[in-house]
A protein has these predicted regions:
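Short, charge-rich amphipathic segments
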Residues: 1-7, 44, 52
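N-terminal acidic leader/helix
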Residues: 3-31
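Amphipathic, hydrophobic secondary-structure cores in small proteins
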Residues: 23-56
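Long, compositionally biased
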Residues: 50-77
């Protein structure tokens, strides 16, 4: 596996874990969480773009962060 492929895999794996963990925090399905994050642009703008900052945190912390961010962004619309 090439470096860029491995790097992409790590980013996607992290995003999936964060989405599923955030969904559990909010009591919604993974699909609903994905769709809501996608609508707000948070999958790319928060989880993928900030991977280097976020992946060093605990999964519980990331789930809290992405859930809180989603709820705040949804309020602004």
């Amino acid at each position: 596996m090439a470096y860029s492929d491995n790097n992409t895999y790590r980013h996607i794996h992290f995003a999936v874990m964060a989405i599923e963990s955030g969904a559990r925090k909010l009591g919604v399905s993974g699909k609903e969480m994905h769709d809501r994050l996608l609508k707000q642009g948070l999958i790319h703008r928060r989880l993928i773009k900030r991977y280097e900052d976020l992946h060093t945190q605990s999964l519980d912390w990331v789930a809290d962060d992405i859930s809180e961010t989603l709820l705040n962004w949804e309020k602004e619309v």
